[in-house]
Amino acid sequence: MSRQSLTKAHAKITELSWEPTFATPATRFGTDYTFEKAPKKDPLKQIMRSYFPMEEEKDNRVYGAMDGAIRGNMFRQVQERWLEWQKLFLSIIPFPEISAARAMPMAIDAVPNPEIHNGLAVQMIDEVRHSTIQMNLKKLYMNNYIDPAGFDITEKAFANNYAGTIGRQFGEGFITGDAITAANIYLTVVAETAFTNTLFVAMPDEAAANGDYLLPTVFHSVQSDESRHISNGYSILLMALADERNRPLLERDLRYAWWNNHCVVDAAIGTFIEYGTKDRRKDRESYAEMWRRWIYDDYYRSYLLPLEKYGLTIPHDLVEEAWNRIVDKHYVHEVARFFATGWPVNYWRIDAMTDTDFEWFEEKYPGWYNKFGKWWENYNRLAYPGKNKPIAFEDVDYEYPHRCWTCMVPCLIREDMVTDKVDGQWRTYCSETCAWTDKVAFRPEYEGRPTPNMGRLTGFREWETLHHGKDLADIITDLGYVRDDGKTLIPQPHLDLDPKKMWTLDDVRGIPFGSPNVALNEMSDDEREAHIAAYMANKNGAVTV
């Protein structure tokens, strides 16, 4: 048996499966897809015997690197600006990983393919491993970084923060709604095949440039598993394509999955890479250049376009619009400014941009200074307490944004905002596609066909609404973003740990916080129309040349 080929071993495993012919199995995870005509193959023939030794070696490398980082005093060299953003990133990323593990039973239940079930089971183990080594990385940062505050509350903070809940929405997309939509198209075909390129390849490169070689070790270990996950997703995609009835659903899901991944992943990873780095070499790639290489060329041209030969309509318009938003509409820079605006309710510190940063941004994104430079200068000016409020509550020509109901990223490209009354509530969307996702895609019927398994976008999706009318100091206290002395805030708009320069609860007490979405629903029709027009026309202090 020890010399048996993998092919024969894989065949033996599939023989252990069985399909009852005397009864219809109970459906645990529903799907509107049909697989009656589907081919049933697993091209990689994944089995545990070859899998576990390989993963053990990768784990040994990860934990060896962690030990080496401590012995080599990595934390004396790593940039504080970079590690502060890891408080947010490493609070979010284990959740999508463990959600992906939860998604695998959904796919196994929904896909009648004994060959691929073993590969999906292996993927489930992968995702648990990924989450585990990421949590261990976060713990190591917490134990060795100069300012552990924020790392120590990430599990709680991730769930109650205005940015963390965007990541939660992203991860919950793997396990909610139609089983194939969630566990295959959204997770595997788009998130893992496309956006792990910037997440697990481009971002580790930036980490290394900032003195952090632990994150590259961990995330390259993660990325090395993705080829198998991509194979699983592609196999199920081909099964679905075998039945013409699935084509409208596939085209719907590709549009939704692509756009939601772009809205969330590009917002987060783009910000971490562009605004978390101190490496401003002129030959260093911008996020836009990384995106062009890793997403547009590597995924769109190499993976998506060939699907057209199967008669599938690819969302070319959304790919081009995502690129347009990153390059021409400054999507990532708008997100970074929003995160910095909200610094009092963060659990990480955000470093101010310097002249070196300004010069680099202007080199990579011509016109950046005219749009964002003045605001960042004001951020520097208002960084310390005593004579001013936090920047969100000062007059710096910046209007706090509405929240997108679908992707939950604020409506930052203001001219693209869509407003509509849906399910008895006035909702704002960052784009036409996010509005379509809520109003058309996630509904019990699609193009005249019943789609009962899609579900709805529900819940408390507007973070600001949960805290409407509260005092800012009370919000921060309720969130738990206060240091051990009971008064100093964990978040700061600078990296100076001098107690005299750090904001406390007393510095923010008496500042009322309001929700734009609550205000929108309280307006009359005329007031609402005027407000929306003014919001969409607001350039937020941009200098017109």
Swiss-Prot record:
Protein family per UniProt: Belongs to the TmoA/XamoA family.
Protein role: Component of the propane 2-monooxygenase multicomponent enzyme system which is involved in the degradation of propane via the O2-dependent hydroxylation of propane. Under acetone induction, also able to catalyze the oxidation of phenol to yield hydroquinone.
Native organism: Gordonia sp. (strain TY-5)
Co-factor remark: Binds 2 Fe(2+) ions per subunit.
Cofactor: Fe(2+)
Catalyses which reaction(s): propane + NADH + O2 + H(+) = propan-2-ol + NAD(+) + H2O; phenol + NADH + O2 + H(+) = hydroquinone + NAD(+) + H2O
Lineage, broadest ranks: Bacteria, Bacillati, Actinomycetota, Actinomycetes, Mycobacteriales
Gene Ontology molecular function, alphabetical: metal ion binding; monooxygenase activity
Protein name, UniProt field: Propane 2-monooxygenase, hydroxylase component large subunit
Pfam families attached to this UniProt entry: Phenol_Hydrox
